C-alpha cells in the first residue's frame, strides 16, 4: 500500500473568479461625504428632499440605495444623500442613510392589522382638522388621533372648521377636561376667520395636518401657504363624506418670519391603532386615567367591576365623561378584535358627545 504523501500549500488550487469581481463583503461604504437632506414628499419610490447647497436651499429627487434594504423612508425623515445633487430635471441622487428619528406618527389599516404604517417622521405637532358640520364631526376619530399623537410624543391641536354652520361650544365641551389647545375657524366673504391664530400656533414647528376628506383641510393649507395648490373637494350630499383630494403627504414651508412647516396628508376614513398597547390607549385619555385607581387589578375596563363607571357617573371626567368612556371601551374592544369601532360608521353628531 502506497504511503500517503504530506500536503503543503503548493498542493492547493485556487479557482479563479470567472467574473473578475471582488468577493462579497459585509463592509459597506460609510458615505462620510454624504449631504444632509430632509424628505418633503414620497412618490412611487422617488423621494423629493430639501438640501442646503452653496447657493442656498434647493430640492433634489432621490431613490433609496440598495444597502438600505426594506428600511422605509417617509416624509420628515432626515437623510444622507450622495450622487447627483444638482437638482436638475434629469438628476437622481441616492438616499444612503436615514438618521435617527425624534418622533414617528404611525397608524395601521385597522385595529387588528399587525403592520404599522409610518406616516411622518420628526414632527412636533398633530393638528386634527374637524368640521363642525358638512360633514358632521366624528368624535371617535378625534379620539383615535389624540391617542396616536400621545403615543408618538406629539403635541395635539384641534382645528375646528365651518363654525359659520354650527356653534363650536358643544363639541369643545367634550374635550375641555383634556386641556387640548384648539382654534375655531369660520368662512366669511373676506376669507377664513381665525387663520391668523392657526398660523401663530404652527409657527416655528413641524405640524402634521390630518382629517376626513371634506373637512376643509386642503382649503386651510392653501390659505396658510399661498401657491400650495392643494386640490379641494366637495362633500357628498347623500353620504355626508368628502372625496379624497390630496393623494400623498407633502411638507410645505409656512411663509413669514416665524417659519415652520405643515405636512398635508391625504384625507383619512380610518385610523387603526393596532400598534398602540392598551395601557397607552388608556393613558391617552387623561380625563379617565385618574378613575382607574378604583379598578381591580388587571381590569380590562369593560367589565362590571370597572371603577370607571362610578367615576364617570359621579362627574369625575366632566359632562362628557360617559361618552368618553364609551369611546375608550370601543377602542379597546376593536383593538382586541371584538366589536369594530364606529370610526368608519355614519358621522357622529355633536349630540352624541354627551
Task: Report the location of each language-model feature.
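Short boundary/loop segments of OB/S1/cold-shock single-stranded nucleic-acid-binding domains
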Residues: 1-35, 82
Amino acid at each position: 500500500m502506497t504511503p500517503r504523501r504530506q500536503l503543503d500549500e503548493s498542493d492547493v488550487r485556487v479557482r479563479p473568479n470567472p467574473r473578475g469581481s471582488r468577493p462579497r463583503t459585509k463592509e459597506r461604504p460609510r458615505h462620510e461625504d454624504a449631504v444632509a437632506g430632509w424628505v418633503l414628499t414620497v412618490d412611487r419610490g422617488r423621494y423629493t428632499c430639501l438640501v442646503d447647497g452653496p447657493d442656498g436651499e434647493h430640492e433634489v429627487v432621490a431613490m433609496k440605495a440598495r444597502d438600505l434594504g426594506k428600511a422605509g423612508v417617509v416624509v420628515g425623515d432626515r437623510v444622507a444623500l450622495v450622487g447627483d445633487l444638482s437638482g436638475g430635471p434629469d438628476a437622481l441622487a441616492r438616499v444612503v442613510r436615514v438618521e435617527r428619528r425624534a418622533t414617528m406618527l404611525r397608524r395601521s389599516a385597522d385595529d387588528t392589522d399587525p403592520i404599522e404604517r409610518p406616516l411622518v417622521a420628526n414632527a412636533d405637532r398633530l393638528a386634527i382638522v374637524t368640521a363642525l358640520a358638512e360633514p358632521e364631526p366624528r368624535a371617535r376619530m378625534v379620539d383615535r388621533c389624540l391617542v396616536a399623537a400621545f403615543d408618538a410624543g406629539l403635541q395635539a391641536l384641534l382645528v375646528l372648521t365651518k363654525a359659520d354652520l354650527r356653534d363650536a361650544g358643544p363639541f369643545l365641551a367634550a374635550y375641555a377636561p383634556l386641556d387640548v389647545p384648539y382654534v375655531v375657524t369660520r368662512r366669511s366673504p373676506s376669507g377664513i376667520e381665525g387663520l391668523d391664530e392657526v398660523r401663530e400656533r404652527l409657527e416655528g414647528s413641524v405640524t402634521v395636518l390630518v382629517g376626513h376628506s371634506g373637512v376643509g383641510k386642503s382649503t386651510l393649507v392653501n390659505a396658510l401657504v399661498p401657491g400650495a395648490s392643494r386640490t379641494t373637494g366637495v362633500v357628498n350630499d347623500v353620504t355626508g363624506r368628502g372625496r379624497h383630494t390630496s393623494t400623498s403627504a407633502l411638507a410645505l414651508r409656512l411663509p413669514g418670519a416665524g417659519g415652520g412647516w405643515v405636512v398635508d396628508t391625504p384625507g383619512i376614513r380610518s385610523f387603526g391603532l393596532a400598534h398602540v398597547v392598551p395601557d397607552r390607549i388608556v393613558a391617552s385619555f387623561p380625563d379617565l386615567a385618574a378613575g382607574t385607581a378604583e379598578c381591580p387589578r388587571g381590569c380590562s375596563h369593560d367589565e362590571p367591576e370597572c371603577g370607571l363607571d362610578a367615576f364617570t357617573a359621579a362627574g369625575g371626567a366632566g359632562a362628557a365623561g360617559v361618552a368618553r368612556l364609551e369611546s375608550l371601551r370601543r377602542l379597546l374592544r376593536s383593538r382586541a378584535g371584538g366589536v369594530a369601532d364606529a370610526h368608519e360608521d355614519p358621522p357622529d353628531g355633536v349630540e352624541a358627545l354627551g
